[in-house]
Amino acid sequence: SEIASIIVPSSGKQELPIDQQLNKEEGMISRPKLYMCRHGEKGMCEYCSPLPPWNRDYLDEHGIKHKSFHAHVKELNEQQNTKNNGLSYIAPLKEPDYTIDLNCGGGHAPYPKGICSKCQPAPITLQQQKFRMVDHLEYADHTILNLFIDTWRQSGVQRYGVLYGRYEAYEKVPLGIKAVVEAIYEPPQASELDGVTLLPWEDEELVDKVALGLGLYKVGVVFTDLTDAKKGDGSVLCKRHKDSFFLSCIEAIMAARNQVKYPNVTRWAASQEYSSKFVTCVITGGLEGEIEPRAYQVSASAEALVKADDISASTHPNMIHIKETSGTRYVPDVFYSKINEYGLEVKENAKPAFPVDFLLVTLLDSFPLNPQPMFMLKFPIEARDFLGELQNMRAVHTQLQLGQGDASKLRDFHFLVYVAKMDILSGDEIDLLLRCVREGKTEDYVALVESGGWMTLLTILDHSV
């Protein structure tokens, strides 16, 4: 769009390629000529003129609950930054901030010794967010998820994983974005029947570097919440539904912390950051006893509440507890808007607790009809020693016997991370290995197998297996 070409990020932070692409698109929804149209082929009227990507009637008609982030930005720009006032541009996005200003210039001692209307956060009114940063979660192949769920199938304990993938355009929502998951990495964890305890992940930076060399990055997390229905048919209990909860209060706060940790870089905010594209996916039981993934994010307001340390988990999984004002933490009045039994919008006092649902944003999820996954996934998965699934020299040797003597045997994320951890290949050779998988060029594969580090690896394998 015209404004997008003028406004570019002023900081060193880089927008994702998908955002750069969608910034340039208008996203107008074309409509066919109808019988009500009274004009020629080249004419246009109110019945067939294109609709803006935020048009509520169109979204409702197609069952789209939330407008996309870029449609939301374009709607705000339409309202605030018309072509007539191009010189007085106003950034359409501003992250909510619920913290008290401890460096207030109002001439009083810093809070808690002094306070004024300037440094005091305004009362908060929570309502369900009308847009979402990511519209869809797609696993590149069903095998990725099946292998992840296998831990529960074999042992009955729950599992947690980090989703590595990329963001792409999602055509079913105007200006939509989907997260495409190519691999699930399982960091160190103590798995139990009713949950997971995460342990220190010392090689996280190395895993991130391997992913980056493949054109991938963290797009979210996934965890299981599965209980066998004891019917002998593989069915599971449906524990998450409209009468219980979808994400528990602890999980919603975890999602908010993750989103704060991985902010979304955008030219449309004065701070160059707004909310996050980080997704939280839970694998749980559906209404028919089937195993199904459900994807969520939490709202920008949820992120702000966590940043301000205003909320905590409660004893009820479907309720978020609001903390008391204490020390340097000032908690303003908090309300939430809901529709009552008469169809009217009313405000309720959110203290001492309010429903988690007011912070949730629901995503769609699916598998592609014609999967073309990046990885073949044959190598043992990390942190599964308790199942007898070991990553060792024998596993590397077995992996290298696969394929047709070409680079296809290298196409496994868990294998690539393990080889990088072995510290046998040099930095340049690791880069060559990752490029070989990413681009699939024969000359890169030839250069790799002829490299000194690769020959050393093969020699070590010959003497170890």
Placement of each model-derived feature along the sequence:
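N-terminal beta-strand/alpha-helix entry module and adjacent surface
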Residues: S1-V219, T224-I322, M393, F413-V419, ...
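Eukaryote-biased recognition of electropositive, low-complexity segments
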Residues: Y274-I424
